[in-house]
């Protein structure tokens, strides 16, 4: 869309309920901390200004201000995982805890802060272990093996080099 329109940024209508659904999808699939940080409010080309607001708040605002609301017809079909979560799971969570969405937003903010902290630590660890010599990157395996728990470090340290499973990297250390 950016290339077609030559716009510098696209604004989406993602809101807090969408973020909760994304979190639950990622949680159900098994994910690391980055998968639990939810939908990013902004990237280089996408901004999500409605992310802090609930679907209910946005609908109320639209109604009060006579703004026409358009709902995607596929949103009602529970054959899609997101919609199943939206219609079957989230209402029960909100019923159990009426402040569930607000609590979730606080939790995601905490997880985002934690993710930043982890990334900074990983970068410092990488600077300590990785040495670039020309086109080659040398790694101190002895120092790498001292990291505990080792498996937590492997994916973030090596994923940008084409490794997608920490077990693959761990296997290299034992060969």
Ranges and model annotations:
Residues 4-13, 18-107, 111, 119, ...:
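Catalytic subdomain that performs nucleotidyl-dependent activation
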Residues 42-43, 105-175:
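AMP-forming adenylation/ATP pyrophosphatase catalytic core
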């Amino acid at each position: 869309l950016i290339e077609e329109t030559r716009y510098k940024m696209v604004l989406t209508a993602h809101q807090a309920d969408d973020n909760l659904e994304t979190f639950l999808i990622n949680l159900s699939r098994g994910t690391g901390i980055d998968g639990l940080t939810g939908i990013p409010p902004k990237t280089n080309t996408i901004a999500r200004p409605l992310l802090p607001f609930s679907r209910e708040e946005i609908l109320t605002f639209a109604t009060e201000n006579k703004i026409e609301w358009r709902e995607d017809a596929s949103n009602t079909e529970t054959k899609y995982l997101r919609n199943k979560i939206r219609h079957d799971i989230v209402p029960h969570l909100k019923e159990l805890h009426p402040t569930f969405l607000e609590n979730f937003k606080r939790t995601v903010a905490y997880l985002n802060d934690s993710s930043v902290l982890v990334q900074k630590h990983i970068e410092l660890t990488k600077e300590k272990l990785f040495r670039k010599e020309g086109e080659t990157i040398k790694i101190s395996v002895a120092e790498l093996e001292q990291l505990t728990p080792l498996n937590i470090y492997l994916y973030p340290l090596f994923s940008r080099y084409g490794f997608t499973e920490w077990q693959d990297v761990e296997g290299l250390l034992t060969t």
